[in-house]
């Protein structure tokens, strides 16, 4: 199957430094691929390369199997959604959504505007202006505008980063629903590991300009390629299991036992659980979650064992 978006050996250098380093990646038709990594790893630059806002130093970019490496941004049929909304403040919501619909006649344009606003749950907002909308509503308009021309792909760069937590969760669900309902192909950039795992059909993890793992969320979580991926996706403890192998044990996979060679040096309330930092006699540090009532105070001696039925991932430490 031809990839909706394809990159082959794409590199972008600034001076001698590769900001994007030999990236080969594909986004499949109707797939939502999340691209996650720490700040400054090259995620947004990769998005800009796909959109045509920057040119690669080397490599090939395709859309629907067609080479667009040297094609101007406006001819790539790409929808863009940024974290700062980028709406035209002097235009109404309807005219913002209509911006990429100039080839449609007036009747079809009006129908498409209403269709897109219904899709993002903003029916009736056609004549309002951006300054009259909340941050979440502005982001919905930005998505409607990106989807309106039926783009080959939608690129979303940290679209929820400027929103408070409750609004972010609600908008996240609505945006994903709109993309699914439209059958859109999408690449969503985020530095939020929980967001990447929750939203993506597949997750691509980026570090220092390179893609270090691409797979389904549950595979990336449970079978990380290396220690960086394992640690970036969530807190963990590394336990030696022999022959240079280590077990990756997540906090919820441990069970606390009173008494032993460990000592609780720190604990933090996380709502559903208390998170403990435990240091063993040999200096090994463990991160262990326990439900309220099963938690231990700082200074308590304890041991931590892997819960029955939990199979920690294996990792060769490099």
Where are these predicted regions, by residue range?
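Helix-to-loop junction immediately C-terminal to a conserved catalytic motif
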Residues: 51
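Conserved coupling/switch loops of ABC nucleotide-binding domains, chiefly the family-specific signature
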Residues: 57-60, 208
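Conserved ABC transporter NBD signature motif
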Residues: 59-67
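The feature captures the beta-strand-to-loop junction immediately N-terminal to the Walker
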Residues: 36-38
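Non-catalytic connector elements of ABC transporters
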Residues: 245-318
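ABC ATPase nucleotide-binding domains
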Residues: 32, 73-79, 83, 87-225
